[in-house]
Amino acid sequence: VYKRQDYSCNKEVNQWAKSNLNEIKKMKVAEWYSINDIVYQKAAYVAFDSNQRKELWLSKLQETLKLDWTNAEKEHISKLIYLIEDNSNLFDNKVSVDDKTDLAIYQWKEYALEQLRWDHELIFSIIKTPEKLNANKKLDTSLYKTPATKNNSESDGNKQPLCNCNSNESHKWFLCSLWFHKCHIGVCEVRSKDCGDLWLYECNGLCV
């Protein structure tokens, strides 16, 4: 179980989160997006309560639904929205993802890949990050400003960096970002959630 009160692998970002924790706990969706740097946004997300996380993902998917899709694609995106709305404990860090939800997420990705012919980048952009898609169904690459693991062990003695990705999935998926595809199990402190699909799964590796 993740107990240590750290929020990022980046020492400076971690300190920012700790210093602004009260504000983060009251942060609305629009404020999260206004941070405009995914590493800082991820740190804020780690500090969020389950309702803040739920509202963020619902907002992202509802905005995604407004883009230009076929009816079949709209229906498929809506399935993720229903999944979130129907699971009150989905984003509770104390509750593991149940087998039914796990299977539903897996089947959602496979249908998107095999039936809708979505590529891995689009699937990543929808289900593996709460970042918004632009009109071209792409992520805003300018948000990747800050190194995810910079200074993660400086001046920390024997303290391990926080794990920041889930390494259990096939290598075919984008695991860390559109640029860092590999997640390797290494010397890092495992967190029970905040990685993988809908950021619901264990963080057990480091992006490389």
Please state what every model-predicted region is.
Residues 10-158:
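Mature extracellular/secreted ectodomains of secretory-pathway proteins
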